[in-house]
Amino acid sequence: MRKGRHYRYGYKKHVLTDGQGLVESIITTPANCADTVVLPELIEKAELTQGISVLADKGYCSKKNSACLLERGLIDGVMLKAQKGMKLTERQRELNNAISKMRCFIEPTFGSIRRWFSGGRCRYRGLERTHTQNILEAMAYNLKRMPGLLVLQSIK
């Protein structure tokens, strides 16, 4: 949203991508909504099969989300967050480092949507319209990436 000359962040876009970076599901929430609340709904929308790793940043770290992933038979790859007054152990830091190395497959999705479709700003007012914009950007991104991925698969 725009107020005067400054833009205010009013919505969050939660995206679940596959291993190749294609968008599988997307949820738009108000900016004041915590990330931890959204992960179970995001996974449910994507209809993930058992045994798949779910990688996420520290904003999605909670005991409830870990239990949800375990219950569905998914591998928990959510980065661990330090508790108040406690530091992460060496093993936990190594785990976070291993997870962060996998972000190179996920982050280009967000950068490409932002670069190709001006995806950094809301064009509309209201949650439903912003969600529609996010869905259209994700569909356009998937369509733009698909021919290149099909060519790569035919070469292999």
Language-model features: locations:
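Short, charged, surface-exposed secondary-structure boundary motifs
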Residues: 37, 85-92
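Acidic/polar loop patches that form or flank catalytic/metal-binding clefts of enzymes
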Residues: 50-54, 77-78, 148-152
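Short, acidic/turn-prone active-site loops that include or flank metal/cofactor-
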Residues: 31, 80-84
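Short active-site-adjacent structural elements
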Residues: 63-64, 86-88, 120-122
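Short hydrophobic/aromatic-enriched beta-strand-loop microsegments
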Residues: 72-80
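Polybasic low-complexity intrinsically disordered regions
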Residues: 1-58, 63-71, 136, 140
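Basic, amphipathic alpha-helical segments enriched in Lys/Arg and hydrophobic/aromatic residues
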Residues: 73, 94-156
